[in-house]
């Protein structure tokens, strides 16, 4: 196998070190380590927010990367990426650290390494969605969890895009199968400006097309509102 490539021939930037931790493609791990990644993933997301694990590892789409944060060959976290077409932007499908190791700063370590990994790969923007703390019917405990998650990303340079009505298709998300979410984005370049209203419409279109595979005329796209950029 050529250094810097996965078993499928997909080219990866070389692992980015931060102290003793390293990001590695999941397909380069041994069977036991892949099993640990699966546990981390399945413990970290409820059923309605996760895909089948094998679809993320053995049956990935072109432009997708499955990465594990590893310490001395032991996985500590998992991230799943998908390129948003030819935009130079990347969608963060999943980002989770081992529940048994939370509170040790691993989320920040993995985030920093992920941004460095994307920078080395020529990426310019990382886009993702999170559960909305303001969703009607969300109980106090869930509001706290969701708000804490948003603040984590904001501390690491991400912003909530000025978008209303953004929803994602999930089989268990209410009667109509669509879940209201917040759309966030973070610049990959060191010190780069955070995206704002001027870029939001293009980001929304790229996410619906390349992450959710919606046709340009899908009514959900028209129902998603983008605030006018500041003058």
Describe each model-derived feature in a short phrase:
Residues 203-231:
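Long hydrophobic alpha-helical segments typical of transmembrane helices together
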């Amino acid at each position: 196998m050529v250094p810097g490539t996965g078993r499928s021939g997909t080219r990866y930037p070389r692992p980015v070190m931060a102290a003793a931790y390293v990001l590695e493609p999941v397909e380069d791990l041994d069977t036991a380590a892949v099993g640990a990644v699966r546990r981390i993933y399945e413990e970290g997301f409820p059923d309605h927010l996760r895909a089948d694990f094998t679809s993320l590892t053995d049956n990935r789409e072109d432009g997708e990367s499955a990465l594990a944060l590893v310490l001395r060959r032991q996985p500590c976290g998992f991230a799943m990426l998908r390129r948003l077409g030819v935009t130079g932007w990347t969608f963060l499908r999943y980002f989770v650290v081992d529940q048994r190791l939370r509170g040790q700063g691993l989320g920040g370590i993995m985030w920093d390494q992920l941004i460095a990994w994307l920078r080395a790969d020529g990426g310019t923007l990382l886009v993702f969605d999170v559960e909305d703390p303001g969703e009607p019917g969300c109980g106090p405990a869930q509001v706290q969890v969701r708000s804490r998650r948003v603040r984590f990303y904001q501390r690491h340079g991400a912003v909530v895009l000025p978008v209303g009505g953004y929803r994602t298709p999930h089989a268990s998300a209410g009667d109509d199968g669509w879940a209201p979410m917040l759309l966030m984005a973070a610049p990959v370049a060191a010190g780069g400006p955070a995206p704002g209203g001027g870029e939001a419409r293009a980001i929304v279109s790229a996410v619906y097309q390349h992450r959710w595979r919606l046709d340009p005329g899908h009514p959900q796209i028209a129902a998603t509102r983008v605030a006018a950029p500041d003058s």
